[in-house]
Amino acid sequence: MKQFIDFIPLVLFFIVYKIDPQNVEFAGFNLSGIYGATATLILASVIVYGALWLKHRHLEKSQWFTLGACLVLGGLTLAFHEDTFLKWKAPLVNWLFALAFAGSHFIGDKPMIQRIMGHAIQLPQGLWVRLNIAWVVFFLVCGFANLYVVFTYPNFWVDFKVFGSLGMTLLFLIGQGIFLARHLHDADTGEKPKD
């Protein structure tokens, strides 16, 4: 559910980008098209993550990082009227997540995915490592896919940012679910998970 809440600002960004046909001048800035969508992304991110923080008095590190990247790169996009800053957001965020997941093999006693999901499921250590590596690869692929689309198909990147990223995430989560289903402890049969 958390990942879908994280997509709310992105979906609003897409909607404003697609339906904002007019030029809006605000404080000397033209906020049509990508710039109106960027302003919407920033505002929606602040509202969504602000509401989550007010409700739970806590945001996950990934949410803080995503919010920070949105504020900094979105702010630079608006301040300099240059969309290149925003175009680098998805690749940078994905690559830094990949770095965090990869680094967790060397820092601490558990891979990142085990720290996130370990309270909910039990797996042998070798499977946690494999699952964590899969997340590293997923984040790297998402980052490079975003970068490729941004600079190869500049008229399509907003569509890909929403639908491509969401589609890749859903496919990966389905694949992860299938992988986990094969290895989870079966409480009824008493079988041990496969390594």
Curated annotation (Swiss-Prot):
GO cellular component terms, semicolon-separated: plasma membrane
Residues passing through the membrane, by range: 34-54, 65-85, 88-108, 131-151, 160-180
Keywords assigned: Cell inner membrane, Cell membrane, Membrane, Transmembrane, Transmembrane helix
Membrane topology (UniProt): Multi-pass membrane protein
Keyword Membrane: yes
Compartments, as annotated in UniProt: Cell inner membrane
Function: Plays a role in cell envelope biogenesis, maintenance of cell envelope integrity and membrane homeostasis.
Family classification: Belongs to the YciB family.
Protein's UniProt name: Inner membrane-spanning protein YciB
